């Protein structure tokens, strides 16, 4: 794979991930609206359970879509490191990408996909969205 193909693949992955993220962000918003309506109308247990399942599913998929972003960057950095280790000279952009990449980039070990965010602010975002979608429904507005 050439450097151009690596960056093209990264950009295509980020565009597709963005489309999925927009879709799931909208569904998380729908879940939040459903929770607001359920709380305002003092909904029954069946409505609360269905709303909780929908909200958790939307939030899970939203988190899953955003887990691809750091993994995509790590995969591109790994591919560039493999390309560099094979003796191919990288452009200044490729070298800059590798040098600016946070963490260790290895040509021998591929990045591992994980849905657990390593950014504390993103973790706080997911936890606050979890409260807004599920916590308000079961705990209330106390």
Predicted features along the sequence, with ranges:
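Cytosolic-side membrane-entry/anchor segment at the start of a transmembrane helix
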Residues: 1-33
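Membrane-interface segments at the starts/ends of alpha-helical transmembrane spans
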Residues: 3-12, 103-118
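Residue-level signal for the membrane-embedded core of alpha-helical transmembrane segments
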Residues: 18-25, 53, 57-60, 124-129
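Transmembrane alpha-helical segments in integral membrane proteins
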Residues: 26-36, 111-142
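Interfacial segments of alpha-helical transmembrane regions
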Residues: 38-59
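C-terminal TM-helix exit segments that contain a strictly Trp-centered aromatic cap at the helix terminus
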Residues: 56-72
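Juxtamembrane non-transmembrane "cap" segments at the membrane-aqueous interface
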Residues: 69-101
């Amino acid at each position: 794979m050439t450097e151009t193909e690596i960056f093209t693949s990264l950009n295509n992955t980020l565009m597709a991930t963005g489309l999925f993220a927009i879709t799931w962000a909208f569904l998380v918003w729908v879940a939040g609206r459903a929770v607001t309506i359920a709380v305002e109308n003092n909904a029954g247990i069946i409505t609360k359970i269905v709303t909780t399942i929908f909200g958790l599913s939307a939030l899970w998929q939203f988190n899953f879509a955003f887990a691809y972003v750091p993994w995509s960057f790590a995969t591109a950095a790994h591919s560039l490191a493999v390309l560099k280790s094979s003796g191919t000279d990288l452009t200044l952009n490729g070298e800059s990408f590798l040098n600016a990449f946070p963490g260790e980039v290895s040509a021998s070990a591929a990045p591992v996909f994980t849905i657990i965010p390593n950014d504390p602010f993103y973790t706080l975002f997911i936890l606050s969205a979890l409260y807004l979608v599920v916590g308000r429904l079961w705990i209330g507005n106390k």
